Amino acid sequence: MKKQILYLIVLQQLFLCSAYAQQKKSGNIPYRVNVQADSAKQKAIIDNKWVAVGINKPYALQYDDKLRFNGKPSYRFELKAEDNSLEGYAAGETKGRTELSYSYATTNDFKKFPPSVYQNAQKLKTVYHYGKGICEQGSSRSYTFSVYIPSSFPDNATTIFAQWHGAPSRTLVATPEGEIKTLSIEEFLALYDRMIFKKNIAHDKVEKKDKDGKITYVAGKPNGWKVEQGGYPTLAFGFSKGYFYIKANSDRQWLTDKADRNNANPENSEVMKPYSSEYKTSTIAYKMPFAQFPKDCWITFDVAIDWTKYGKEANTILKPGKLDVMMTYTKNKKPQKAHIVNQQEILIGRNDDDGYYFKFGIYRVGNSTVPVTYNLSGYSETAR
């Protein structure tokens, strides 16, 4: 009997130690995934729901066991001044990224297909379309996440800490004659074999030999073909021009015009006053002076979205969207709750076949190199 009791005690201790080890996480998160072009290996999947994207430096993304949320380690993100590694929206600009993506695919998602399906998805940059995390076009969903902004955070930083993106397909193209059409996968692959794509612009593929006779290919002149590539986030929470802001973007054009950079400025735009071009609308749904934004505490955002419904090739809006945002936190040991966006009708989304996916972290834009550090945690999403 004593042996049985001792055995049960040992088992209990092992279970408790295992549970504690699962809760106690700290240090660098080392793996990165290009969700558009690669599947995620098991070791790269974080807490069974994320993969990391962006710059891979030891400090860029870490578990933070000292700053916990609901008893679990949070995610600490950091970009230093020299960490902008991407081309910016405008010529000559740069931007930086260290984020967690809720959408990704694994090899299991391709098991029922022949190998060519994955190989083609890599070329199409649609690997993540086969996996998890993308909601349906025109659907309704609820999202929750929490952010911790330290009082040391610079008031001149320009960063997006949470964003929703569309999931476009490169099979939607414009021909050199200006015809907009959707290619079959085989038709797109025929273009892929003889062209190099830089963002949405196709260039002739030019053969080049090095001194050893090895053949490589470089981009020649633009040849008039354009492919769908996406655009601004459909919804973004961030800081810019001395403000915390929430911005919704809409693009009703079937093939996005990348030259149209219609984009509301948090500093100058009025709240809920849309800023529009022919096809695009950008709206500051909420803004708050940065000095008033709560620091050194966890802030939870509960977000309800009815995504706008679009008319595909007709370039029309069938039904506007709706946005609702609650902001809760604790100040001086007292719970605070603010209904900062109250069931507002709004244009929000993209005219694509597929819907949207969530990312949070640091997305430093506007050519900013101001160092930034903050923590995020507590994400969930549900269909409504």
Swiss-Prot record:
Q: Where in the cell is it found?
A: Periplasm
Which GO terms of the molecular function aspect are on file?
heparin binding; heparin lyase activity
Q: What induces it?
A: By heparin.
InterPro entries attached to this UniProt entry: Polysacc_lyase
Q: What is its EC number?
A: 4.2.2.7
Recorded hits in Pfam families, A to Z, give: Polysacc_lyase (PF14099)
Domain of life, per lineage: Bacteria
Modification type Blocked amino end (Gln): residues: 22
Posttranslational modification, per the record?
The N-terminus is blocked.
Report the principal subcellular site: periplasm
Keywords assigned: Glycoprotein, Heparin-binding, Lyase, Periplasm, Signal
Reactions performed catalytically: Eliminative cleavage of polysaccharides containing (1->4)-linked D-glucuronate or L-iduronate residues and (1->4)-alpha-linked 2-sulfoamino-2-deoxy-6-sulfo-D-glucose residues to give oligosaccharides with terminal 4-deoxy-alpha-D-gluc-4-enuronosyl groups at their non-reducing ends
- Functional description taken from the UniProt entry: Degrades heparin and heparan sulfate. Also implicated in the release of heparin-bound growth factors from the extracellular matrix.
Q: What is this protein called?
A: Heparin lyase I
